[in-house]
Amino acid sequence: MDLRSSAETDPDLSENHPGSVPAELQSRKQEQEKLSGVVKSVHRKLRRKYIEVGDFDKIWREHCEDEQTLSEYAMAMKNLADNHWANKCEGEGRIEWCRSVCQEYFQDGGMRRVLEKDEKSARHATAGNANTDTNAPPQLSSISTSSTFQLGKIRLLDVGSCFNPFLKFDEFLTVGIDIVPAVESVYKCDFLNLQLQQPLQLASDALDAFLRQLRGPIDALPAELFHVVVFSLLLSYFPSPYQRWLCCKKAHELLTLNGLLLIITPDSSHQGRHALMMRSWRVAVESLGFKRYKYVKFSHMHLIAFRKVSPTTSSDLVSRNYPEMLYIPQDFNTFDEDGFADCYEPPRSDFEDDQMACSFAELPETPYDSDSGESQSSSAPFYELEDPILLQS
């Protein structure tokens, strides 16, 4: 009789033979470490090449042509999600967070509340200007039928989707894209080189029909098409801050006005360790025409929601060095013959100390700095990233 296979279905037997289950768990742990190694090696290779060559366009083009490596990466990620992460998330997963933010914002009045807040602020600003400029034109109400969400499907673009986790939710009309999809429902697409077309002047149901007839590979999409764009564990994949910034800029162009950009990025450090980085990210993303809506720090990641508040972006973004503000700790890693060494962190100057002090306003304990008035933190374990996938430091 095979005690191990019986223990999987008979809890009493597993209690009588406690040694059988640890052997299985050990095997699962070894498999998880192997899959995690595949993922981390791809990221390490990309960063090494970027440090050596410096031409992120060339590096990315060669990376997208390496079909074998990309296929191994996609299958490793899907295997981790299906067989290792799913049983441990216990309701605090990144996908559930994205869904809850969308439900609160689009279906439970969140959008209307922030628009009313915007309108109130505009009235106060107008009243202040009226004291010095009696010829100032009256401000029109910002809350209109076109700026609030109408009942229907929430059009969601999941970039770097891999296995299309949002497809199971009825409230979303999901388009999942990836450079190498792990499942058939995800379309092949290189988001960095995606071409943007003029917005479609169609009713909402016609836009839904347009998305339903999409076929891969996707090389171009109309602007202002989606209510939500999701970057889940995406930005840290890229070795260059400029590539991360281009992704955020493209997301802004693809979103409708007041649409949401949801960014999830890994970080196993304690809550205040990278507060300066989160402040830097906020400034960079908001420079594109966003405003932060929510910010949550889980044990192993940052989860940030931005809403699109401006239909256009400034033409003077690169000169202000906004792209470089989307850095991650791994950008400062050095490498030797065996791979990456420990992350080097230079001593802070007095100016940086002042900036660090200011950055503590970014911590989730200060709810007033998100325009929803809500920020959260969680110390509960988030097992999905305990591998630690994507983390080098």
Swiss-Prot record:
Gene Ontology BP terms: cellular response to amino acid starvation; methylation; negative regulation of TORC1 signaling; regulation of TORC1 signaling
Keywords: Methyltransferase, S-adenosyl-L-methionine, Transferase
Stretches for region Disordered: 1-35, 118-141, 362-393
EC number: 2.1.1.-
Coiled-coil blocks: none
Annotated InterPro entries: Bmt2/SAMTOR, SAM-dependent_MTases_sf
Enzyme class: transferase
GO molecular function terms noted in the UniProt entry: methyltransferase activity; S-adenosyl-L-methionine binding
Source species, domain of life: Eukaryota
Compositionally biased region (Low complexity): 125-136
Keyword Cytoplasm in record: no
The protein's role, per its UniProt record: S-adenosyl-L-methionine-binding protein that acts as an inhibitor of mTORC1 signaling via interaction with the GATOR1 and KICSTOR complexes. Acts as a sensor of S-adenosyl-L-methionine to signal methionine sufficiency to mTORC1: in presence of methionine, binds S-adenosyl-L-methionine, leading to disrupt interaction with the GATOR1 and KICSTOR complexes and promote mTORC1 signaling. Upon methionine starvation, S-adenosyl-L-methionine levels are reduced, thereby promoting the association with GATOR1 and KICSTOR, leading to inhibit mTORC1 signaling.
Homology family: Belongs to the BMT2/SAMTOR family.
Oligomeric and partner information: Interacts with the GATOR1 complex; interaction is disrupted when samtor binds S-adenosyl-L-methionine. Interacts with the KICSTOR complex; interaction is disrupted when bmt2/samtor binds S-adenosyl-L-methionine.
Protein name, UniProt field: S-adenosylmethionine sensor upstream of mTORC1
